[in-house]
């Protein structure tokens, strides 16, 4: 008789993954393994996207196997536009399925929203560690949703910024963010005000047209571009994309899914995993962009860590 899979709620996932910083070492390894090709032991196709045009949404399916963890997962993620600030349904919803890789048995069904938020922020922190200017004092976050909170949490754990700024299209949400998080955050009235002189910029918006322009960005700054996950969506303008040194999580995915890359015609310099491995340089003296689309193996790493923690405490 097959055993019933574990069902882990968002609260339980949070309990077993209290700090995003726990993900940094295994994610660095996973990114390096992914960029090593088949010998790296990561089997991961580009996500499959099923448009739900009638309702302005889509379903994404993200499977991966990682030999290092001997872990097999699939994430199901939905995105629906224009939920609005009064909606009780978030724009993104996700569920992660963890399987026993030796026989395919379903081990666990996990809330994927916490996993997505924390692993994405951890990967941005890894990119920033390698690509930020040597003396980085000002952090700017564009957007005030779930990813803004997860990025703020790990960035204030991992780095020492003297000033943190935030901008959001709806200023009330930026003010709520500043009132909610620990530490002082300056709320800015415009993107230009927020990014002026910033050393590290994080874009976590629902923008479909550019909101960040190269002429506003300090030379030598590092940008983590996290939003705009579809081929016709953008957060960054042509000037910034073409003048910066461009790093991505997956070159294959970026050339299929990233509007920031496709519509600007920018040339990809390296995958982040190649920088971690030391086969491509980190040009921290230049303006850099890390285009993060998110990869299934990142969910695999997080899900295995959570499941192992849950299993040990049963």
Swiss-Prot record:
One of its GO terms (molecular function) is NADP binding. NADPH binds at residues 82, 92, 119, 144, 146-147, 168-170, 173, 205-206, 226, 228, 292. The keyword Cytoplasm applies. Keywords: Cytoplasm, Deafness, Disease variant, NAD, NADP, Non-syndromic deafness, Oxidoreductase. InterPro entries: NAD(P)-bd_dom_sf, ODC_Mu_crystall, ODC_N. The keyword tRNA processing does not apply. Expressed in neural tissues, muscle and kidney. Expressed in the inner ear. Its EC number is 1.5.1.25, 1.5.1.1. GO terms for cellular component: cytoplasm; cytosol; extracellular exosome; mitochondrion; nucleus; peroxisomal matrix. Changing residue 51 to L: In DFNA40; uncertain significance. It is found in: Cytoplasm. 3,3',5-triiodo-L-thyronine binds at residues 47, 257. GO terms for biological process: lysine catabolic process; negative regulation of transcription by RNA polymerase II; sensory perception of sound; thyroid hormone metabolic process; thyroid hormone transport. Inhibited by thyroid hormones triiodothyronine (T3) and thyroxine (T4). It holds the Pfam family OCD_Mu_crystall. It catalyses: L-pipecolate + NADP(+) = Delta(1)-piperideine-2-carboxylate + NADPH + H(+); L-pipecolate + NAD(+) = Delta(1)-piperideine-2-carboxylate + NADH + H(+); L-proline + NADP(+) = 1-pyrroline-2-carboxylate + NADPH + H(+); L-proline + NAD(+) = 1-pyrroline-2-carboxylate + NADH + H(+). It comes from the Eukaryota. Optimum pH is 4.5 for the reduction of 3,4-dehydro-thiomorpholine-3-carboxylate at 37 degrees Celsius with NADH as cosubstrate. Homodimer. Binds the thyroid hormone triiodothyronine (T3); T3 binding inhibits enzymatic activity. It is linked to Deafness, autosomal dominant, 40: A form of non-syndromic sensorineural hearing loss. Sensorineural deafness results from damage to the neural receptors of the inner ear, the nerve pathways to the brain, or the area of the brain that receives sound information. Catalyzes the NAD(P)H-dependent reduction of imine double bonds of a number of cyclic ketimine substrates, including sulfur-containing cyclic ketimines. Under physiological conditions, it efficiently catalyzes delta(1)-piperideine-2-carboxylate (P2C) and delta(1)-pyrroline-2-carboxylate (Pyr2C) reduction, suggesting a central role in lysine and glutamate metabolism. Additional substrates are delta(2)-thiazoline-2-carboxylate (T2C), 3,4-dehydrothiomorpholine-3-carboxylate (AECK), and (R)-lanthionine ketimine (LK) that is reduced at very low rate compared to other substrates. Belongs to the ornithine cyclodeaminase/mu-crystallin family. This is Ketimine reductase mu-crystallin. It comes from Homo sapiens. The lineage of its organism: Eukaryota, Metazoa, Chordata, Craniata, Vertebrata. The gene is CRYM.
């Amino acid at each position: 008789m097959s055993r019933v899979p574990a069902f882990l709620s968002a609260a339980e996932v949070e309990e077993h993954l209290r700090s995003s910083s726990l993900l940094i070492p295994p994610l660095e390894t996973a990114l390096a393994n992914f960029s090593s090709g088949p010998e790296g032991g990561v089997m991961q196709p580009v996500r499959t996207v099923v448009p739900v045009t009638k309702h302005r949404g889509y379903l994404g399916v993200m499977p991966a196997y990682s030999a290092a963890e001997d872990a097999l997962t699939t994430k199901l993620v939905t995105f629906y536009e224009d939920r609005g600030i009064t909606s009780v349904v978030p724009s993104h919803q996700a569920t992660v399925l963890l399987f026993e890789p030796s026989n395919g048995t379903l081990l666990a069904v996990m809330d994927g929203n916490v996993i997505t938020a924390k692993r994405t922020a951890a990967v941005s922190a890894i990119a920033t560690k390698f690509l930020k200017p040597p003396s980085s004092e000002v952090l700017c976050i564009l957007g005030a949703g779930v990813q803004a909170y997860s990025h703020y949490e790990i960035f204030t754990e991992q780095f020492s910024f003297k000033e943190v700024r935030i901008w959001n299209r709806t200023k009330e949400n930026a003010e709520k963010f500043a009132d909610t998080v620990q530490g002082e955050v300056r709320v800015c009235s415009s993107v230009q005000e927020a990014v002026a002189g910033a050393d590290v910029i994080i874009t976590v918006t629902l923008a479909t047209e550019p909101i960040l322009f190269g002429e506003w960005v300090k030379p030598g700054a590092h940008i983590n571009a996290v939003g705009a996950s579809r081929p016709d969506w953008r957060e960054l303008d042509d000037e910034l994309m073409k003048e910066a040194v461009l790093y991505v999580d997956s070159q294959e995915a970026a050339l299929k899914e990233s509007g920031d890359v496709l519509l600007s015609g920018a040339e990809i310099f390296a995958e982040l995993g190649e920088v971690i491995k030391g086969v491509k340089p980190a040009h921290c003296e230049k303006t850099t962009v890390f285009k993060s689309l998110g990869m299934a193996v990142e969910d695999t790493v997080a899900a295995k860590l959570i499941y192992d923690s849950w299993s040990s405490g049963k």
